[in-house]
Structure formats: C-alpha cells, structure tokens
C-alpha cells in the first residue's frame, strides 16, 4: 500500500505544482499587461483548473476511467447529489460553521457565467480526475483494501479544501464518489455527482433564501426541514440500493 500511496501523493503534488506554475505565469502576464481587474481571481482559478485537467490527460493514463458507465447509474447520480445537498443545507441552518473563504467564493459567484463554467463544470472535472482518477486510481491498482483506499483519497480531498464548511461536504461527497468509482471504474458517476452539486450551489448563490421562506414561522420551517430530511434519507437509501443491484 505504501508504494501506491506514494505514487498517488506524488501525482497529486506534481499536478498541483504544475498548475501553480501556470497560474504564476498567467499572473505575471496579467501584471505586465495591466490586466488586473475584479475578474482576475476568477480567471486565475479557471487557468489553475484547466492546467490540472490538461496535465492529468497528458501525464496519467486515466482515459480508461472515462469509459462509459451504466445509464441507470448515471441517472441516479444527480438524485444522490441533490439529496445530500438538501440534507447539508438543512443541517447548516441549525449548525453554524464559519467559512474562511466566503469572500473568495462570493467574488466568483458575482459573475454568473464564470461561476457556472469554473465552479460548476471545470472544477468538478479537474477534482475528480485528480482525486479519484489519480490518487484513488493509484491506490486501487495495488492490494489496498477498497474502503481504506476510498478513505485515504477522501481525507486528502477534504483537507485540500482548507475550510471546515467545505471539508464536511467534501468528505461526504468524496466517500460516495469514491465508492461509485470503485464499483464502475469510471469517472463519469463521480463527475456527474460533483457537477450537479456545484451547479446547484451556483444557482443557489443567485437565489435569495429569504424570498423562499418569507412569511414562514420557525415551527413551519422546522416541519418542512424534518420532512425534507426524511424524504432525502429514504431517496438516498433506495437509490444506493438500486445502484448496488445494477452493477
């Protein structure tokens, strides 16, 4: 397992370093060309993500992981993502967890198009290629216990987010994404789940929660939240059971 873990870690570090060098070059040209503006952070993030995708496709043999997966599993993935997102949103209403990078995320979310492309599409693809394709892929190639491999890749995936709010959701999504990758040996299920989650968050960032809950009492909100939790747990249980029977 040590050999596979070393290979996965090396792939992770190398990929991130290459992406950071590309971003530094981009920032240098931006400074020379006086290109600094409010979208500079967003563009830098986009360059970073694109560099990760390009480097992984060039350096690592993950094309086999981009093979087709069963249609039924692909259709179940958005249901899983939305159910988990709703559960996290409900619990987040009652448990305050500080977000250290809220301003950075807000700056991206101010531009709907860039938010959708960068956070909603490119970033999920890059992260799944890196953490499931490279890290988990290396671990599973050896004799590592699948759940230990999934746990290690999920832990690294969570830590890399660097703030408690995202670490919790990343851990939950990471375990499910890792399990789907292990079952199908395809990145598409985890990419679909990750993309659905991020796109939903982008849409949610442009929606005012106060307009949805306007006029509701605390008791009414509590009842709605309890019903949502029950529904989501039932849906998740049935969906995971269906996926297990499919593949």
Enumerate the language-model features and the residues they cover.
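Membrane-interface starts of transmembrane alpha-helices
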Residues: 33-50, 111-118, 145-153, 186-189, ...
């Amino acid at each position: 397992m040590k050999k596979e873990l070393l290979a996965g870690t090396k792939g992770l570090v190398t990929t991130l370093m290459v992406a950071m060098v590309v971003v530094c070059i981009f920032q240098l040209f931006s400074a020379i060309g006086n290109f600094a503006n409010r979208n500079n952070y967003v563009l830098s993030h986009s360059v970073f993500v694109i560099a990760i995708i390009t480097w992984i496709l060039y350096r690592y043999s993950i094309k086999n992981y981009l093979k087709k997966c069963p249609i039924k599993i692909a259709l179940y993935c958005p249901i899983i993502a939305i159910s988990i997102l709703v559960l996290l949103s409900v619990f987040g209403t009652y448990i305050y967890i500080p977000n250290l990078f809220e301003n950075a995320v807000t700056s991206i979310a101010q531009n709907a198009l860039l938010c959708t492309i960068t956070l909603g599409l490119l970033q999920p693809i890059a992260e799944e290629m890196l953490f499931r394709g490279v890290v988990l892929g290396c671990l599973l190639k050896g004799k590592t216990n699948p759940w230990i491999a999934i746990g290690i890749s999920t832990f690294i995936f969570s830590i890399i987010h660097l703030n408690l709010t995202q670490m919790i959701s990343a851990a939950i999504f990471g375990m499910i994404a890792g399990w789907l990758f292990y079952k199908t040996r395809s990145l598409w299920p985890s990419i679909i789940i990750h993309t659905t989650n991020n796109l939903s968050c982008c849409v949610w960032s442009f929606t005012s929660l106060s307009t949805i809950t306007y006029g509701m009492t605390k008791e009414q909100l509590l009842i709605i939240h309890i019903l949502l939790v029950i529904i989501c747990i039932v849906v998740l249980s049935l969906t995971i059971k269906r996926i297990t029977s499919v593949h």
